[in-house]
Amino acid sequence: MTATMQTERHALDVIYERRAVRAYKAEDVSEERLRALLEAAVHAPTAMHHEPWQFVIVQNRALLKRISDRAKEIATAQAAHHGNLLKRPGSAGDGMPSPMADPGFNIFYDAGTLVVICAAPTNDFVVADCWLAAENLMLAARADGLGTCCIGFAVAALNTPEVKAELGIPSAVHAYAPIIVGVPQGDTTLVPRKPPVILKWIRG
């Protein structure tokens, strides 16, 4: 645990303050801070205490750019499937072009670190386990003053044979949860959330 994370903070404060960060400073995240995040990740709940998660950490900007370009190719080819997800954030109309068509757009938002949470698909719960680990990692990052963002559009590219080979991911292992990590450029606006949708509250 880093010095910043040792400061007492209420767990709910960290939960409510976490936001997807899409603008990062150029400075890299140290190995010490990343190891603290990974330690938090592996303390996530896991079905039957299976602990299936494995991690790949990428801090090579040229490689991140190549993966970003490959992910954009795949997303553009599957545009009909992705639908509104390909619109620019906040766009309601059809006239706004997809950022995937912009050669300068980086799906990792120029963050210097990508953490890929992987697992062998040995049971029905490994996907949930990996995303629970991702949430722990993101909350720990927020507590340490770092920003994170889930990059779902990277999943398809990360699971292509050529990218898996470059990242050292075995063929029997699947990349499930790609999370960028970095030092935020300023504060991220807090976005109001919808209230919980309760289908039914059953009491005894």
Regions found by a protein language model. Name each.
Residues 15, 37-41, 179:
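Short alpha-helical scaffolding segments that buttress acidic/His motifs in well-ordered protein cores
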Residues 42-50:
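Glycine-rich phosphate/pyrophosphate-binding beta-alpha loops
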Residues 39-43, 99-102, 163-166, 184:
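Glycine-rich, charged/polar anion/phosphate-binding loops
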Residues 1-28, 32, 36:
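Short acidic N-proximal helix/loop "leader" segments that mark the beginning
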Residues 2-7, 11, 17, 98, ...:
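C-terminal helix-cap and adjacent tail motif
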Residues 51-128:
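Glycine/small-residue-rich phosphate/adenosyl-binding loop
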Residues 75-87, 166-191:
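A glycine-rich helix N-cap at a beta->alpha junction
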Residues 41, 113-165:
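Small-aliphatic-rich amphipathic alpha-helix that forms the alpha element of a beta-alpha
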